[in-house]
Amino acid sequence: MKSNKLTSLLCALALTGAALPLSMAEAAEPAPAAAAQEAPAEGVNYTDALMKGLSLTLPDVQSAVESGTFKNLSPEAPKPAEPEPAPLPEPEPELEPEPEPEPEPAPAPAPAAKYTADQGSAAAEIGSDGAYDGMTYSSDKADENALRVSMAYITAKGDTITKSGDTSSAENSDLYGMNAALLVTHGGHGAFTDVKISSTGNGATGAYGYSKGTYINLTNAQVSTTGAQASGVEVSQRAMMKVEASTVTTTGDQSPAIRISQNGGILLTENSDFTASGANAHGIYTQGDVTVTGGTVKAEKTKAAVIKNISSITLDGATLEGNETGALPYNIVMYSDADAIGVTGTQQFEANHASLISHKGGMFYVTGTHCRITLKDSTLTQDEAAPVFTITGNDGGYGWGDAGANGGHAEVILSQQILNGDILLDTISDINLNIKDQSIWTGAITIAPNAQEGAPYKTNADVFIAEGSTWNLTADSQITSLFNLGTIHYNGHTITLADGTVMKE
């Protein structure tokens, strides 16, 4: 059947002239034989097969088709497989570079110091919570605390702490408590009752608290220091101390009874007595917040108190006494360092039912700072010839700002207060005086040219007198403005306002 079909096709091709010359058939190379039977003979496209393979003879084609070895080269059929390319030679392995020699290890760093502040050493150090009663601690070495309490909560009753030996660094003693008899530091808490603390070395503070979170309580304590730059009680870096029913004395030069040093702190006293008898040894020297309730604070040879930068003193039923013997005859000085002038914040001084005593000079000197002074039902005793308030610039010699640009700026509030004394300002300074709550002020206001010829301040003296309060003039006065709801007794004197208005009876 297949043979008859093939024969018929060949005849049809011959009749249409599709057959090729014999010479072309002889010149063509024979087709390669299939490696294996790829498809059965059924379904072969004979016309296509003959057109692709006319170089073969009819018997050859017929025989190949019948045996299934003739290659079907129709477009629908798969093309012969191409030979696989010869595998590429494997690349020679790259030589690994020789490893670099390892560097010698760096020397191990020195162990970190236990504290960043230089506080020196300690003869005895307590680092565990507990009660330590009836103990005795002493040190006679330089830069050494007799007792140090670090990061521990302790109580102690009836202890004795003595210290001799000078500091090698007055700065470290002041800022960090180096060489203090008692140092509580780095968050330690110490409650000491009936304790006796004494020191004889320079820079040997009696009791010192350092750093935020540190707290010292002294109850019925006796603290004394005799060396120079040896405060009675002191805190810094936001530490806190409370002194109750205690006595604190210092006799050395520049040894205040109460001191708050760098970056402030809080020091509270109740019914305690503080005395500083050395030269330039203030009763209070503060860069923090001091509250004195009851008791006395006395400086025998200098100012009663110095308030530096943004800090405060509050007196409640207490006595603050000074006896200035130096070039600045004032009892309470409020100032700022040159780099602190203009910093946001206000110094504070408040006296409630208190007594302020100045044995030489006026009571308040305000320069190079902004402050608020509140006097309520307190008694002021001073040299009658000196102003009660002197609010002026300064020559810069003490480092209190630049001359001509370091005026004082004060808000003064009198509440239930009887005050006698004049007020002196210069043209780069100002006062805002508020007389209220049935207060009576007897005195005058004088505005003098700034000695360094600084640019005048926009206002110099603004006075407000509330209903029920009184101003008794003792001399002609110059002010910027007046708001009066109370009473003014001119006593034959005048008040001249900044706009030229002259007020008189």
Task: Describe the role of every protein-language-model region.
Residues M24-D129, D133:
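Low-complexity, acidic Ser/Thr/Pro-rich repeat tracts that form intrinsically disordered stalk/linker regions
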Residues Y137, I197, G209, I216-T225, ...:
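Fold-core signature of tandem repeat domains
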Residues G53, P109-A170, I495, V502-E505:
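N-terminal segments that cap or nucleate solenoid repeat domains
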Residues D129-G134, Y153-D159, H189-D194, Y215-N220, ...:
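All-beta strand scaffolds that present successive hydrophobic residues in beta-strands
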Residues A112-S121, K141-R148, A170-L183, G201-G209, ...:
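Extracellular beta-strand/beta-solenoid scaffold signature
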